[in-house]
A protein has these predicted regions:
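Membrane-interface interhelical linkers
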Residues: 1-22, 71, 122-124, 135-162, ...
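Helix-helix packing/entry segments at the starts of transmembrane helices
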Residues: 47-52, 120-136, 171-202
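Cytoplasmic-side transmembrane-helix entry/capping segments in multi-pass membrane proteins
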Residues: 16-26, 69-81, 99-104, 123-135, ...
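Juxtamembrane helix-entry segments on the extracytoplasmic side of multipass membrane proteins
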Residues: 13-16, 84, 89-109, 146-162, ...
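Hydrophobic transmembrane alpha-helices of multi-pass small-molecule transport proteins
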Residues: 72-89, 212-231
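C-terminal transmembrane-helix exit sites in multi-pass transporters
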Residues: 9, 54-75, 148, 195-214
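Transmembrane alpha-helical segments that form core, pore/gating elements
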Residues: 4, 93-152
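Hydrophobic alpha-helical transmembrane segments of multi-pass membrane transport proteins
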Residues: 21-39, 104-116, 147-185, 222, ...
Length: 237
């Protein structure tokens, strides 16, 4: 990202520094809560609760961004949400474990982050958003690195670089999507992450999904198709 910014002679002038800092802080906090939750409650529970963030984002979009309430998008989101629950099969025991509520707070914080990304995408070029937010995230990451850093070997370094490249590429596409449409439209597609994880799990680790996982993945796909087919129907009607 830095090389692209330098190559294009980008002027990094932002009047939205508070938004950038808040967005980066929300991202770090949300991920930290997710990782902490996995330690104390089943991983499927932590991930399932955290994946409520698109629902929070849709609610916030209505009140903060003044986006219209569209029933078809909510139907698509809840179909995908149901697919996620089927796929992960969480126990969701809120009564006996306070860390479940911590993960719920993390999901809300991630929902806030999505709204902040939408606000930034309407005010600044996406490359500038990528550069500034990753710079801030790097500076935040220096603090825990001081205490826990271990020199990676060559293969670990390649893996870390690959992860970073994948994350930046994902952010690139996500920012472009946010810039071009409403938050409530994008929300159902968040759950497709689990479908791709299942496919990659099969390709790289030979893990064959069971029938319940396939049903969950199918529901997630149906949620995404529900919006697209409805849009295409309107275009060709």
């Amino acid at each position: 990202v830095s090389l692209i910014v330098l190559f294009k002679n980008f002027e990094l002038k932002s009047s939205n520094l508070r938004l950038h800092i808040t967005r980066s802080a929300c991202g770090w906090t949300g991920v930290a809560i997710l990782f902490s939750g996995v330690i104390f409650i089943p991983a499927s529970d932590a991930v399932a609760i955290t994946f409520l963030n698109p629902v929070f984002a849709m609610l916030l979009a209505i009140f903060v961004l003044k986006e219209r309430f569209k029933i078809n998008r909510w139907i698509a989101t809840f179909i995908s949400l149901l697919g996620m629950l089927v796929l992960l099969r969480p126990t969701l025991d809120f009564e006996s474990n306070i860390f479940a509520y911590l993960c719920l707070a993390g999901a809300f914080i991630m929902g806030v982050e999505i709204i902040l990304i939408k606000l930034l995408s309407e005010r600044e070029p996406f490359l500038q958003i990528l550069f500034i937010n990753n710079l801030i995230a790097t500076l935040i990451g220096v603090v825990p690195m001081i205490f826990f850093f271990k020199v990676p070997n060559f293969f670990q370094l390649i893996e870390l670089i690959s992860i970073a490249a994948a994350m930046v590429l994902g952010q690139f596409f996500f920012l472009n999507a946010m810039k071009g449409t409403e938050t409530t439209f994008i929300a159902p597609f968040f759950y497709s992450t689990l479908v791709f994880v299942m496919i990659l799990d099969l390709i790289f680790f030979g893990v064959i999904p069971d029938i319940i996982s396939l049903i969950g993945a199918s529901l997630i796909i149906v949620g995404g198709l529900f919006i697209n087919l409805r849009i295409n129907f309107k275009l060709f009607k």
